[in-house]
From Swiss-Prot:
The keyword Signal applies. GO terms for cellular component: plasma membrane; side of membrane. It is found in: Cell membrane. Expressed only in flowers. This is COBRA-like protein 9. Glycans are attached at residues 63, 111, 121, 169, 203, 326, 355, 397, 409, 429, 470, 550, 561. Pfam families: COB_C (PF25079), COBRA (PF04833). It is a lipid-anchor; GPI-anchor. Keywords: Cell membrane, Glycoprotein, GPI-anchor, Lipoprotein, Membrane, Signal. Residues 1-23 form the signal peptide. It comes from Arabidopsis thaliana (Mouse-ear cress).
Length: 663
C-alpha cells in the first residue's frame, strides 16, 4: 500500500499538467489575415503620371436622335513622381467625340483659344496660375505641390450613358518625355506614365529656376523692368525669326486674368480708350484716389496697335526704340532693324497681388496683320531674365525683374481662306488662266447672283488689268470666240485683295524668261512688300536675275536655295492701293496698284528642263508671308504654236465688246 500511493499521486499529477488533445478542445473560427491594399498605378510610376477620370455624364437638350448632346464632367490629373521639377507642364488630351469644352479649372488651352472651345480633335492644356510641378524630394512629399488636378466640364455628342466618352490618348508634350499608350484602368479611367527620354541629358539640379528660351516664327518677350507694390512697368518685344514671315498693321491682344488694367503706354496704343469697366468694376473700390480719366483702358482683352512714324519722337506716346512703324515687322533678310517692334505698358494690379514680387503676365496671346500669315501663340513661359544696356550709359547690362516668353508659329489650317491668288499665262497661249473662283472666299450675298462652284472662265490679256466686276463683257466675248459654253449663273470672282500674274514670256535654246506682275486690288498700301516663289529644283538651278526687283535665292524650310526672294528696288518698294481712273471716260473703273519685273533663267545647268509644263511654273507663291492660292490648270500649247488663231471678224467682235465695257 505504501508503494502504490506514490504511484497514484504521480499519475494524477501527470493528468493534471498535460494539456488536453485537439479533439478535446472546443472548435475555433480561423480569421484570415487582411489582404494587402491594391497598388495604385501612380505608385508604380517614377516619372510623370497622367490620368483622365470620367466622373459623370447626362443628357441635355435639345432632343436630337441624329446628334444628341450630353454633358460630361471629368478630371485630368498630372502627378510628378520623378526626380526633377516639371516646368510649364503641357498635356495633350485626345478628345474624339466633337467635344465643346466649357470650363477647365487651374489650366488654360495652350494655343490661347478662349472657352467655350471646340476641342473635338484634341487639345493641349497648360497649368495656370501654377504651371510648375515640384518633386517629392523638393517638397518632402507634399502632393499639393506635386499634383495638378484639372476639373473639366463640357458637351459631347452621341455617347449616351452608360457608355463613357473617354479620349483616344493622353500624353505629356513637354520636350524630352516619352509616354506609352494609355492603359484603361477601368471603364472610366485612362492612365499612362511618362518617363524621360534617356537620349536627352537633363540638368536635374534643384536650383534650376527657369526654362531656356525657345525658337519660333515670332517671339514675344514680356519683361518687367520696374516693379512696385500696386503696379509695374513692362516692356513688350515682338521679334520676327521667319525669313518669309511678316506683319503689316499688326494687332496684338491678350487676356488680363487678375483684373489688371493699363494706365499708360509708350510705343503703342489700345484701339479703344475707355475706363468705364474700371469705374463700374472692383478697381474703383480699390483705387479710390485715382483719376480714371487718365487710365488708357480697362478692357479685359485689349487690342494693341502700333503708332505711326510721326509719333516716333513724341516724348509722351513714342520715344521707344523700334516703335512707331504703322505695325510693320519685316523679315531679317530685308532689314534687321525693322524685324523687331517694342512698346511699354504701366500695368496696375489688384489685390491680393499688392506685392512687388506678385507678377503675372496676361494669357491667351494673339497677333495678326493685314494680308499676313496666321499665327498661333503659346502661353507665357517664365525664362531667364532679359539683359539690356544700362540707360545711364554705363558699360554694364541691366536685368529685368522677371521675363516671360510667348512663342508664336505660323499656322495653315485646312479650312483657312487665302488672302491672295495667282493667275497663269504664257506666250504660247493667248488666254489667261485667272485666279480660282472664290479663291479668297465668297460671302453669302454674292452667291445669290453667281456660282461659287463653277470654275473661272478664261479671260483675254486686257481683262487682267480690270477689276472683276468690269471684266464681264470682255470675258463673255472672249469665251464666245473660243467656242466655250457659258455657264448660268456665271462664276463668282476671286475676291482677293492681291493677285499675282505669272507669265511665261519666252522659251529659247539657252534659257527662258518669266514676267511677274503684282496687283493690289485693296484699299491698303503695302510698303516694303516682298514676294517669294518656290519651284522645282531644276528651274531654280537656272535662276540668274530679276530686272526690276531685287531678287536672290533663299534657303527655307530645311531646303537649300529653294526659294526666289524678291523685293522692290529703292523707290519701287511701295505697292499702292487701288485708285480711281483719272480718265473721266473710264470713271467707273478702278485701277489697281501694280509692280512688275522680268526674271531671267538659264538652261546651262538644266538642259532637259521642260518649262512649258510644270517645270516653268511655281509650286508655291508667298506675298508678304501669306501663301497665295494657285490655279488648278496650266496654259496649254497647241502643236508647239500659239493657241487659238483669231480671224479679222473675231477681232472686230471682241474689241466691240471691249469698247462697250469701257463706256
Amino acid at each position: 500500500m505504501g508503494v502504490l500511493l506514490p504511484i497514484f499521486f504521480g499519475v494524477l499529477l501527470l493528468f493534471t499538467v498535460t494539456p488536453p488533445s485537439m479533439s478535446q478542445l472546443p472548435p475555433t473560427i480561423m480569421v484570415p489575415a487582411p489582404a494587402p491594399a491594391p497598388i495604385s498605378p501612380s505608385d508604380l510610376c517614377n516619372g510623370i503620371f497622367l490620368s483622365y477620370d470620367f466622373i459623370l455624364g447626362r443628357k441635355i437638350p435639345p432632343n436630337d436622335t441624329a446628334d444628341q448632346p450630353y454633358r460630361f464632367e471629368s478630371v485630368l490629373t498630372v502627378l510628378n513622381n520623378g526626380r526633377e521639377e516639371l516646368k510649364e507642364w503641357r498635356v495633350f488630351v485626345g478628345f474624339q467625340h466633337n467635344e465643346i469644352l466649357i470650363s477647365a479649372t487651374d489650366a488654360l488651352i495652350v494655343n490661347g483659344t478662349e472657352l467655350p472651345a471646340l476641342v473635338g480633335n484634341g487639345t493641349i492644356f497648360g497649368g495656370y496660375p501654377v504651371s510648375d510641378l515640384k518633386t517629392a524630394i523638393q517638397t518632402a512629399g507634399d502632393l499639393k505641390q506635386m499634383t495638378a488636378e484639372i476639373e473639366l466640364v463640357g458637351t459631347q455628342f452621341m455617347v449616351a450613358p452608360p457608355a463613357v466618352p473617354l479620349p483616344s490618348n493622353i500624353s505629356l508634350v513637354n520636350e524630352g518625355w516619352l509616354c506609352p499608350v494609355p492603359t484603361l484602368q477601368s471603364k472610366r479611367e485612362l492612365t499612362t506614365c511618362c518617363i524621360r527620354d534617356a537620349s536627352i541629358i537633363v540638368n536635374t539640379t534643384i536650383t534650376t529656376k527657369f526654362l531656356p528660351r525657345q525658337p519660333g516664327d515670332l517671339t514675344i518677350m514680356y519683361d518687367v523692368i520696374r516693379a512696385y507694390d500696386q503696379n509695374y512697368l513692362t516692356e513688350v518685344t515682338m521679334e520676327n525669326h521667319n525669313p518669309l514671315g511678316r506683319l503689316d498693321h499688326w494687332e496684338l491682344s491678350f487676356d488680363w486674368m487678375r483684373d489688371e488694367f493699363i494706365q499708360k503706354m509708350q510705343g503703342a496704343y489700345p484701339t479703344v480708350v475707355d475706363a468705364t469697366k474700371c469705374i463700374f468694376g472692383p478697381q474703383s473700390l480699390i483705387y479710390t484716389g485715382l483719376d480714371f480719366a487718365d487710365v488708357l483702358t480697362c478692357e479685359r482683352r485689349p487690342i494693341i496697335i502700333d503708332l505711326p512714324p510721326t509719333k516716333k519722337d513724341d516724348s509722351t506716346l513714342g520715344n521707344i526704340p523700334s516703335c512707331c512703324r504703322n505695325g510693320t515687322i519685316l523679315p531679317r533678310i530685308m532689314d534687321p532693324s525693322k524685324s523687331v517692334s517694342v512698346f511699354t505698358m504701366q500695368v496696375a494690379k489688384m489685390p491680393p497681388d499688392f506685392n512687388r514680387s506678385a507678377l503675372f503676365p496676361p494669357q491667351n496671346w494673339r497677333i495678326k496683320g493685314t494680308l499676313n500669315p496666321d499665327y498661333s501663340c503659346g502661353p507665357p513661359v517664365r525664362v531667364t531674365p532679359t539683359f539690356y544696356p544700362d540707360p545711364s550709359g554705363m558699360p554694364t547690362n541691366k536685368s529685368s525683374f522677371a521675363s516671360w516668353q510667348i512663342v508664336c508659329n505660323i499656322t495653315q489650317a485646312k479650312t483657312e481662306i487665302p488672302k491672295c491668288c495667282v493667275s497663269f499665262s504664257a506666250f504660247f497661249n493667248d488666254s489667261i488662266i485667272p485666279c480660282n473662283t472664290c479663291a479668297c472666299g465668297c460671302v453669302s450675298e454674292t452667291r445669290r447672283t453667281c456660282s461659287a462652284e463653277t470654275p473661272s472662265l478664261l479671260i483675254p490679256p486686257d481683262a487682267l488689268l480690270l477689276p472683276f466686276e468690269n471684266r464681264t463683257a470682255l470675258t463673255l466675248a472672249w469665251n464666245a470666240l473660243k467656242h466655250k459654253t457659258l455657264p448660268n449663273p456665271m462664276p463668282c470672282g476671286d475676291n482677293c485683295g492681291v493677285s499675282i500674274n505669272w507669265h511665261m514670256a519666252s522659251d529659247y535654246r539657252g534659257g527662258w524668261t518669266v514676267r511677274i506682275t503684282i496687283f493690289n486690288w485693296g484699299e491698303i498700301d503695302f510698303p516694303n512688300w516682298f514676294l517669294a516663289v518656290q519651284m522645282k529644283k531644276p528651274a531654280l538651278l537656272g535662276f540668274e536675275k530679276a530686272y526690276s526687283f531685287n531678287a536672290s535665292l533663299l534657303s527655307v524650310d530645311g531646303g537649300v536655295n529653294n526659294t526666289i526672294f524678291m523685293e522692290g528696288l529703292p523707290g519701287l518698294d511701295y505697292l499702292v492701293a487701288e485708285a480711281d481712273e483719272k480718265d473721266p471716260k473710264k470713271k467707273n473703273i478702278r485701277i489697281p496698284g501694280k509692280q512688275q519685273s522680268v526674271i531671267q533663267f538659264s538652261k546651262k545647268l538644266t538642259p532637259g528642263i521642260n518649262v512649258a509644263e510644270r517645270d516653268g511654273f511655281p509650286a508655291k507663291v508667298i506675298f508678304n508671308g501669306e501663301e497665295c492660292l494657285l490655279p488648278d490648270l496650266l496654259p496649254m500649247a497647241s502643236g508647239g504654236r500659239r493657241n487659238g488663231a483669231i480671224t479679222v471678224l473675231s477681232f472686230i467682235t471682241f474689241y466691240v465688246a471691249a469698247f462697250m465695257v469701257l463706256l
